[in-house]
Design a protein with these regions (language model features):
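Structural microenvironment flanking redox-active thiols in thiol-disulfide oxidoreductases
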Residues: 35-75, 89-95
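Short acidic-hydrophobic, aromatic-tinged amphipathic segments that line or gate anion-handling sites
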Residues: 4-5, 82-87, 119
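Short active-site neighborhood of thiol/selenol oxidoreductases, capturing the structured segment around
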Residues: 12-41, 57-59
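Conserved beta-strand segments of alpha/beta enzyme cores
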Residues: 57, 80-82
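Thiol/disulfide oxidoreductase modules built on the thioredoxin-like
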Residues: 79, 89-133
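Short loop/turn microsegments at loop-to-beta-strand junctions
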Residues: 1, 21-22, 103-104
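N-terminal "domain-start" segment that seeds a small globular fold
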Residues: 1-15, 128-134
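N-proximal helix/coil linker or "cap" segments that precede and/or mark the start of modular domains
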Residues: 1-5, 15-19, 47, 68, ...
């Protein structure tokens, strides 16, 4: 579990997110690969359907703690995602809660916030989502 901060200053906890699946999208606003991943996630039909149904919550998480950079990129994250940054002075990175070797980094979690896919990419995520979940979309 970790604390995140929203643009309006409110804080939340990962375990407070109520959805069947949670996708953690660790990014840097200046990273071209992060931009590409964000654009692909926003267009994948399965991801879009799951987000719209409320079964998937995407948490865009800027882990570097640079508030100015995060504020400047507020409009690049889709409105249907939680746009967050580290609310505890880089605790997520410092305490190594997630192995973020580089960005972008994607983690798919189940409803209990257990890791299903670790440090994956959007192609593997899409393949997994189209496996067990495709019949229920």
């Amino acid at each position: 579990d970790f604390v995140y901060m929203l643009h309006d200053g409110r804080k939340g906890r990962l375990h407070g997110i109520r959805s069947e699946y949670t996708l953690l999208y660790f990014y840097d606003p200046d990273c071209p690969d992060c931009r590409h991943t964000r654009e692909m996630l926003a267009e994948l039909p399965t991801v879009v359907a799951l987000v719209q149904s409320g079964r998937l919550q995407i948490v865009a998480f800027y882990p570097d703690g640079e508030a100015e950079a995060w504020e400047a990129c507020r409009n690049i994250i889709p409105d249907t995602w939680l746009n967050t940054c580290d609310g505890t002075e880089e605790l997520v990175v410092r305490e190594k809660l997630y192995a973020i070797r580089a960005v972008p980094s994607l983690y798919l979690l189940d409803s209990e916030k257990r890791v299903i896919l670790k440090d994956t990419d959007y192609n593997k995520l899409d393949a997994w989502l189209n496996g067990p979940l495709s019949a229920s979309l």
